[in-house]
Regions:
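Glycine-rich active-site loop/strand segments that organize a redox cofactor
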Residues: 46-96
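Short N-terminal binding/cap micro-motifs at the start of the first secondary-structure element
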Residues: 14-16, 37-40
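A conserved short coil-to-beta-strand element within the FAD-binding core of flavoproteins
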Residues: 126-139
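Short beta-strand to alpha-helix junction loop
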Residues: 69-77, 96-115, 125
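Core beta-strand elements of the Rossmann-like FAD/NAD(P) dinucleotide-binding domain
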Residues: 1-3, 143-147
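N-terminal Rossmann-like FAD-binding beta1-loop-alpha1 element of flavoenzymes
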Residues: 3-30
Length: 147
């Protein structure tokens, strides 16, 4: 399969990355070894998903490249994700120090991310183990255990 973007891992960051790339017109494939996506999301926050923190700020992250964090958080803030949560009518509450949790189940966040991926026409490859990634002149080749 040919794609403009291959995202390895269908966790929260992987699904969000795939969704945004797809919605920006890229052909995206999202590959995960698990057959059921979002397992870590499903168990986070005791099954209620701690989906963001209102107090996220660049000075609260350690990085070899502090400019990356400043840029990333300036372009997509916790408020942006909260707006998406509200568009999907997911009830939430603040538990402690800006930590936001679903009132219901973490499944709601997984469903939100799946729908955002669908809106970007993301192709799914679940139950697929990545054997290696190879740099080639045209980009990268992702070799799976099925190749």
């Amino acid at each position: 399969m040919r794609a403009d973007v291959a995202v390895l891992g269908a966790g929260a960051a992987g699904m969000m990355c795939a969704a945004v790339a797809g919605q920006r017109g890229r052909r995206v494939v999202l590959i995960d070894h698990a057959t059921r996506i979002g397992e870590k999301i499903r168990i986070s926050g005791g099954g209620r998903c701690n989906f963001t923190n209102l107090h996220s700020a660049p000075d609260r992250f350690l990085s070899e490249n502090p400019a990356f964090c400043r840029s990333a958080l300036a372009r997509y803030t916790p408020r942006h994700f909260l707006e998406m949560v509200q568009r999907y009518r997911i009830a939430w509450h603040e538990k402690h120090r800006g930590q936001l949790f679903c009132d219901d189940s973490a499944e709601r966040i997984i469903e939100l991310l799946k729908r955002e991926c669908e809106a970007g026409a993301v192709q799914w490859r679940t139950g697929t183990k990545v054997a290696r990634v190879e740099k080639v002149s045209a980009g990268f080749l992702v070799h799976t255990a099925l190749d």
